[in-house]
Regions:
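C-terminal substrate-binding/catalytic lobe of Rossmann-fold NAD(P)-dependent oxidoreductases
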Residues: 224-273
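One-carbon transfer enzymes
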Residues: 1-227, 232, 266-267, 274-281, ...
Length: 311
């Protein structure tokens, strides 16, 4: 009879929560480690320590010693990393072979990087999913143990996709554990299809009206909602973030430059011309003054014929 394995989880994000709850309910969770400074996750996970699960706050500089202590004191069979922000050292990988596995919240090898959720939505991918892979010295390059795909719908935001993937991660645990106990080594990644996307920077979360069409901007707004409170544009030195938008079809061609405000009223909404003579209605925006319907920006001086510019 195969013994019930003991599993420790290293995490830094709410996406790990359903999996933590599932492992705890099944009596498999032997420890949790959370990156220091993440008060939201630390506060949530404190309930685990109250129920007897050892809880470790991991610092960046001494993480190898802390992780080693966690493994040794709990006799964990497997360590699952779920959005853990730092690499596992070569020494730990050598000393504890076939122990460390990463939950990558995107499809490998084509969606490597720090935020595959953002990139999947921004690129309007047709599907996404979770890839569980063995951790080795190279980031996101280990052998794939299990991959689960889901369709990526056109209304999915960064936040809603994170929630969907978090429950997908919890749902695949049983199958994953069976594979690991069967000593499955996984499938090597095809480097010919590999792509790496760095963590989104300021240029990635700003609109370029002259280069991007309406569908591109609409997808970018969803990719930035809610973590960045939308995608940036600017009017008269005032930063505006577009949280939710709708592509408008069937409008007549307009001679104005991309970024021109074509409508700003309650009836038609806040409509802006984009590249390739496409049109976008800015439904919800965020400013320092708060979240509001796009058309309400008329109270701040924006007018039809005005120009939104790149940040």
């Amino acid at each position: 009879m195969i013994n019930k394995p003991k599993i420790a989880v290293l995490c830094n994000n709410r996406m790990a929560v359903p999996a933590l709850q599932s492992l705890h309910a099944e009596g498999r969770l032997c420890a949790v480690g959370v990156a220091e400074g993440n008060t939201d996750v630390i506060d949530f996970c404190s309930w685990l320590s109250q129920s007897g699960v050892p809880f470790f706050i991991i610092g960046k500089e001494n993480r190898s010693l802390q992780i080693r202590k966690m493994v040794d004191t709990t006799a964990a069979d497997y360590i699952f990393t779920m959005t853990f922000p730092w690499k596992i050292s070569t020494e730990l990988l050598h000393d504890y072979p076939d122990t460390f596995y990463n939950f990558h919240y995107g499809l490998l090898p084509e969606m490597r990087g720090a935020d595959p959720v953002f990139e999947s939505i921004r690129s309007r991918a047709k599907e996404t999913g979770i890839t569980v892979h063995a951790i080795d010295e190279a980031i996101d390059r280990g052998a794939m143990i299990l991959k689960k795909n889901i369709p990526l719908t056109a209304d999915m935001t960064h936040g809603s996709l994170c929630t969907r993937l978090s429950w997908l991660g919890a749902g695949l645990l049983h199958e994953l554990i069976v594979l690991l106990q069967s000593k499955v080594k996984g499938t090597l990644q095809d480097e010919q299809h590999a792509q790496y996307f760095p963590k989104p920077g300021i240029a990635d979360v700003c609109i370029s009206w002259q280069k991007q069409d309406a569908e591109t901007i609409e997808a970018l707004a969803r990719a930035c909602n809610p973590w960045n409170k939308g995608v940036y544009t600017q009017w008269n030195g005032w930063n505006i973030r577009i949280v939710e938008a709708t592509v408008v079809h069937g409008m007549a061609s307009h001679p104005g430059l991309p970024g021109t405000i074509l409508s700003l009223d309650k009836e038609q909404g806040f409509i802006v011309k984009c590249n390739h003579d496409t049109h976008l209605r800015l439904d919800i925006v965020c400013t320092d003054e708060g979240f509001m319907s796009g058309h309400k920006l008329s109270a701040f001086g924006l007018k039809k014929g005005g120009q939104l510019i790149n940040l």
